[in-house]
Each structure stands twice: as structure tokens, then as C-alpha cells.
Amino acid sequence: ESTVQGKLLRELDLLSPIKSMISSGLPVFGTCAGLILLAKKTGDGAVYLDAMDIKAERNAYGRQLGSFRTKAVFDGIGEIEEVFIRAPYISEVWGDAKILSSVDGRIVAARQGKLLVTAFHPELTSDTRVHGCFLDMIRGDR
């Protein structure tokens, strides 16, 4: 998905305006492919929005059949259910990026300023605390 999304961002000349808006403080929550789009580095060298001090590894959790649910601690929230669908993970964090959640030693959520990324899909559970965390970040409460 991130490859197609990145291609469309380029073809539709959206990369530069979106990068500019992010640089100007636009809050962004990148889920799964969005994590890859926001990363400054990726395992395959493809960089799109170049916004977060993270390195993303795409399709790290395998194919669709490798999708799974697990519980993990999310910083500032506590234990939550995390749903992974052919998910990436974060292999490196530097600069201002902060790790928020890890599963089996792999980083699956991070933030930097008003940017939040998750390798998992919080919208596939009934728990809205991760979305609430993003809203708190926007308001400056977190």
C-alpha cells in the first residue's frame, strides 16, 4: 500500500505541499502504511514524506495470513490491544522521535512533536485511547 500511495503522492504532485504543511506543524497520525510514508529512512531506501526520525521496515509481519492481534503497553495509556495486518515496524529511532510501544522487541509506535505513527490498526478495536492520545498531542496536553 505505501508503494502505491507514495507513487500517487508523486504523480499528483502532493508530496511537496504535504511536506510543507507537516513542516509548518500539521498534526499527522500515520497508521501502518502511513508509518512508512512519514519515515525518514526505510529498509528498501524508498522515502516519501521524510518527516519522522525513524527507519521503517515494510511488511515485517509477513503476508495477510500472518496478521495477528496482541496486547502491549502503550506509553501513557497502559495495555492496549494491537491489530497487525502485514504491518511494518520501526527498526531505528533517533533525534526527537520517542518510542511509545514495542512488541517482541520491535518498535510498533512512536511520536515526534505532533506526528504519531503506529504499525498496528487502532481503528480495528473498540478502544479509542490511542486516538485520544493523538488528540491530546494536538492540544499540547501530552
Language model region names:
Residues 24-25, 52, 113:
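Structured helix-beta-strand junction loops
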Residues 89-142:
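C-terminal and late-domain segments of enzyme folds
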Residues 42-106:
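Pocket-forming structural segment of enzyme catalytic cores
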Residues 31, 85, 126:
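A conserved hydrophobic position in a structured secondary element of the catalytic/binding core
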Residues 1-30, 36-42:
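Flexible gly/pro-rich beta->alpha loop and the following alpha-helix that scaffold active-site loops
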